[in-house]
Amino acid sequence: MSDQFDAKAFLKTVTSQPGVYRMYDAGGTVIYVGKAKDLKKRLSSYFRSNLASRKTEALVAQIQQIDVTVTHTETEALLLEHNYIKLYQPRYNVLLRDDKSYPFIFLSGDTHPRLAMHRGAKHAKGEYFGPFPNGYAVRETLALLQKIFPIRQCENSVYRNRSRPCLQYQIGRCLGPCVEGLVSEEEYAQQVEYVRLFLSGKDDQVLTQLISRMETASQNLEFEEAARIRDQIQAVRRVTEKQFVSNTGDDLDVIGVAFDAGMACVHVLFIRQGKVLGSRSYFPKVPGSTELSEVVETFVGQFYLQGSQMRTLPGEILLDFNLSDKTLLADSLSELAGRKINVQTKPRGDRARYLKLARTNAATALTSKLSQQSTVHQRLTALASVLKLPEVKRMECFDISHTMGEQTVASCVVFDANGPLRAEYRRYNITGITPGDDYAAMHQVLRRRYGKAIDDSKIPDVILIDGGKGQLAQAKNVFAELDVSWDKNHPLLLGVAKGADRKAGLETLFFEPEGEGFSLPPDSPALHVIQHIRDESHDHAIGGHRKKRAKVKNTSSLETIEGIGPKRRQMLLKYMGGLQGLRNASVEEIAKVPGISQGLAEKIFWSLKH
């Protein structure tokens, strides 16, 4: 053993709690990482007079330093040990063995990979994660993985001979790849990749991918899928929060913030003695047009300085946002605690990772909250209540797009009880109006849309007119003039005007072209569905306008000249070196192009000049 390492003094300081230890050599390199149910007992075994293994003797002889990280449970220690092994690749974790072989978690290389415990030589094709201290730890980890990432754990002999899924599928512990049609190849491969990343200690990547998939599902109104992924995210978060332990014994609160659709989420991680004890998401009420800095500053003040809360203050608070009164807040908290409290906004190292975790959790919690509140059914029910309608089954929204009055396109998007009905979206090319006259454009599109027979099931309950009072007046005039067989009085015409700064959440709604409008709170589900359909209509109109503009741009001036087909056009451009050369050519020069007569050359010349 190294003369510089005092084992006796060290062991006096070691706890009997579970945890992970890292052994360093004289060069500061981690040479071994271990896990123990009782750290004191396990570490004492290394410094007995009669060591059973020469390899253990070789390890102990090189120890210069030992760092210990206490965990809540053995499982927590197991996960942390695995992360450290993957991080440091200690050479004695590869060479050193106890009397029995170490078990591994095995991810097979089959078409539908399976998870299993493995001991002995690694002959089978696949990936091995470990080693783990004992079989119980592997089985416990496999059970945990099965709950979060339900990939198969059955033997191949069972898997190949199944015609219907087993009980594991019925209780949600397996995706059932043994039966065709139960799970797509892509989804199963994705879950396998999550397992691979998770066992490699890349928990953040797993969370990032899951959050992205949840947001996509939510945006596509696939709420059951979004809820399933949300539950998976929460399960991963529960594990990652337990396993993340800091080297520095941090005693701090970490506050991450997310803001969207008029709603804010403040997520607080409570870290004591370097361990994440827990976390909680708060959803403060946010008035419209409130700056994010004000949300953070107000929340922090209320959270810590209200006497009734009686919160235990940490030594340090990490914030996701710069505060103008950071020094004042720190001084106030220090006075309250009777000791120095640091408020930090630009952390580095592990602290930055803590803040990233808090920020991710805030975004995840906010997305979940919005998903719960923003189902189409809930939004339409809220809208019906605001508009004093019995129900809203179908909505249509119109928008106009043009560039300086040119290539005007109107869009109509349709929502039903399940959200966007994209198969019924329509674009209308507007012609015969004064360029830039949006009122005339709205008048034309509404007459074309509603001045004909409509099936009763296609009559909208609400028609949204993007543009405010003027456009709403046009809509009212059109419906007053309609001579149709269907009930033209059934749809409620609603004007939507953007706020002064054209910011989401500041919209004004109008029932009539005259008089004052009204606004909804920025976190109102009714407002969210209005914003959603309006944004869809706007994007649809702009998309159509861009296509029309691109078509005009890509259409050669030669295409409008009678007698010039594709072959002659190609010959002219090739002979003249492009359209610009053709524009600069004389009639005589154009007439020299094969296939171009004198008369046609004159027509081309004057068409390009005028």
From Swiss-Prot:
Pfam families with a match to the protein in the record: GIY-YIG (PF01541), HHH_5 (PF14520), UVR (PF02151), UvrC_RNaseH (PF22920), UvrC_RNaseH_dom (PF08459)
Protein's cellular compartments: Cytoplasm
Cross-referenced CDD domains: GIY-YIG_UvrC_Cho
Biological process annotations from GO: nucleotide-excision repair; SOS response
UVR domain span: 204-239
Coiled-coil intervals: none
Stretches assigned to the GIY-YIG domain: 16-94
Keyword check for DNA damage: yes
GO cellular component term of the entry, any: excinuclease repair complex
Molecular-function annotations in GO: DNA binding; excinuclease ABC activity
UniProt entry keywords in alphabetical sequence: Cytoplasm, DNA damage, DNA excision, DNA repair, Excision nuclease, SOS response
Main location: cytoplasm
PROSITE patterns: GIY_YIG, UVR, UVRC
SMART domains: GIYc, HhH1
Transmembrane region(s): none
Cystine bridges: none
Entry function: The UvrABC repair system catalyzes the recognition and processing of DNA lesions. UvrC both incises the 5' and 3' sides of the lesion. The N-terminal half is responsible for the 3' incision and the C-terminal half is responsible for the 5' incision.
Family designation: Belongs to the UvrC family.
Subunit record text: Interacts with UvrB in an incision complex.
Name of the molecule in the record: UvrABC system protein C
Gene: uvrC
